Swiss-Prot record:
Record's protein name: Flagellar L-ring protein 1
Keyword Oxidoreductase: no
Annotated Gene Ontology cellular component terms: bacterial-type flagellum basal body, distal rod, L ring; cell outer membrane
Similarity field: Belongs to the FlgH family.
Compartments it resides in: Cell outer membrane; Bacterial flagellum basal body
Keyword Magnesium: no
UniProt gene name: flgH1
Organism: Vibrio parahaemolyticus serotype O3:K6 (strain RIMD 2210633)
Alphabetical list of Pfam families matching this protein: FlgH
Length: 259
């Protein structure tokens, strides 16, 4: 009986030891924990042949790769009582802007992207060849073969080509998105990342942005223009029925490729 009780005690203590949390850094913790989002379909199974025929995988809200950063709470340090109300631990510079400097700080990016490209080409080619020879004469008379054909020819050849091509493309996006600082580089630059989801009737629309910024480019109101973001990745699209109706079906894509 004593052996059974001892074995049960050892098993219980081993299980409790396995429940201890594993310490991870802030970035790793943020990218492995998915926030609870209403309507999150990240764990839903694929609909099989439907997704295959659609030819794409729609992004979902709560993707671990876009999870927000949750910095750990720093331990409090109690200073010795000096009788003064001033605390150097909570000092704030009167002339310093409260710009984001650490992991988890937020910043608003002003989306103002406009791109336009135009290309045109014209080509005109023309070539003309002419060759003539008067009839041969011998003794003042034309030399003929069989009394019918003389030795003369007249050749004309003209080649022309005209080509015209043009291409034009333009894109524009404007709006706002608030993102978080996920990493502080050695030179002081900040790596930012964030997304915004909007549910509209039968579908969702999302904006995703990531890149690197300089703290000096941040405005006094904690905003920065999107054209100041280095290595910017901006995604604006949607999911659902409205998005599906904008794309050709499986058979249409098949015949377009086959033909």
């Amino acid at each position: 009986m004593k052996r059974i009780c001892l074995l049960a005690l050892i098993t219980t203590m081993s299980g409790c030891a396995m429940l201890e949390p594993i310490e991870t850094d802030e970035v790793t913790q943020a990218t492995t924990v998915v926030d609870a989002v209403e309507g999150d379909k990240s764990k839903d199974e694929s609909s099989g042949i439907v997704d295959t025929l659609r030819g794409r995988n729609d992004p979902v809200a709560g993707d671990p790769a876009w999870a927000p950063i949750h910095p750990k709470q720093k331990p409090e340090h109690y200073a010795a009582a000096t009788g003064s109300l001033f605390s150097p631990e909570h000092i704030t510079d009167l002339y310093d802007d409260s710009k984001p400097r650490g992991i988890g700080d937020i910043i608003t990016v002003t989306l103002d992207e406009t791109t336009s490209a135009t290309k045109s080409a014209n080509a005109d080619l023309s070539k003309t060849n002419e060759a003539q020879m008067d009839p041969l004469q011998v003794g003042g008379e034309e030399l003929k073969v069989g009394g019918k054909y003389n030795f003369s020819y007249d050749l004309n050849n003209t080649n022309t080509f005209a080509g015209d091509s043009s291409a034009k493309q333009s894109n524009s996006i404007s709006g706002y998105i608030t993102v978080e600082v996920i990493e502080v580089l050695a030179n002081g630059n900040l790596v930012i990342r964030g997304e915004k989801w909007m549910t509209l009737n039968t579908g969702d629309e999302y904006i995703r942005l990531s890149g690197t910024i300089r703290p000096d480019d941040i405005n006094f109101d904690n905003t920065i223009a999107s054209n100041r973001v280095s290595n910017a990745r901006i995604q604006y699209s949607g999911t659902g029925l409205s998005q599906d109706m904008q794309e050709p079906g499986f058979l249409a894509r098949f015949f377009n490729v086959a033909l």
